[in-house]
Amino acid sequence: MRKFFLFFLLACLSAAVAEAQPDFHAGFGGFGGAEPDFKDVNYAGDDLEAHRLDIYLPKTDGGSYKAVVAIYGSAWFSNNMKAITYFSLGKPLVEAGFAVICINHRSSGDAKYPAQIHDVKAAIRFIRANAAKFKIDASFIGITGFSSGGHLSSMAGVTNGLKDAEGEVGGNLTFSSEVNAVVDWFGPVDMSRMNKCETVNDEKSPEAALIGGAPKDNPEKVKEISPVSYVAKAEKLPKFLVVHGDADNVVPYCQSKFFSEELRKKGVLEEFITVPDGQHGPVTFNEDTYKKMTEFFKKEAGMK
């Protein structure tokens, strides 16, 4: 079942990228183009594939570049899909003048939550600690991701400054893991309402694998992994842009609707973009939504 889900997700993503970015071919899944400027950098000081990242820099001599961390979707089942993140989200950001950091993270098979958010925060601290080496202007670090990567991106935003979510992966604990802006692409954000927008999913669901048990038997863990649970009490929320297709048959469209309503109450929702007939990747990834993403990050970063 997990292999089928990953195949389905990759097929959807490949179709989406082909539709939205028809000008680059070869490499992963038939797509190619840029090679990272820094490849397979380990951000945790170990030898895990799950703790590697790639950095792509703009092809201009800008000295240092404000940055966006990008996270793949895999239903948390993969620990090594950073290569596709550039082609799904990173390319338009690099072209807009950002350094893009595509990260791996531990899968639900490697370790249960909160290992995944600890990895994300470790990568951000690592980038801040080594900003000069990688030509990054760490005064702005945004984050974006699709599907489960959207979940982790949103989680990074809603837990800004929350010590309990920090972890100690890779050290660099004197550096901040806070993010300055978030773009969530159809991420699951309320695990208590994943089944028909009303109830939890069953014990065979990806979120069950993430927490190591049936959601119905673990209400506190369900709350812990749901970004929507943190919004009301969060003290350092960045601005959010949320994108979701209303024909998504993997992550219910209502997930982003619920989340956006809570973000709006806190005054941190830039926009909730509904893509008519948008699926879990196809149609939702398009020239207009990419432009919305880059313009939002540029605005929050103070870039012209």
Question: How would you describe each model-predicted region?
Answer:
Residues Q21-G63:
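N-terminal cap/lid segment of alpha/beta-hydrolase-fold proteins
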Residues L241-H244, D248:
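Short beta-strand/loop motif that positions the catalytic acidic residue
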Residues K112-A132:
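Alpha/beta-hydrolase active-site loop
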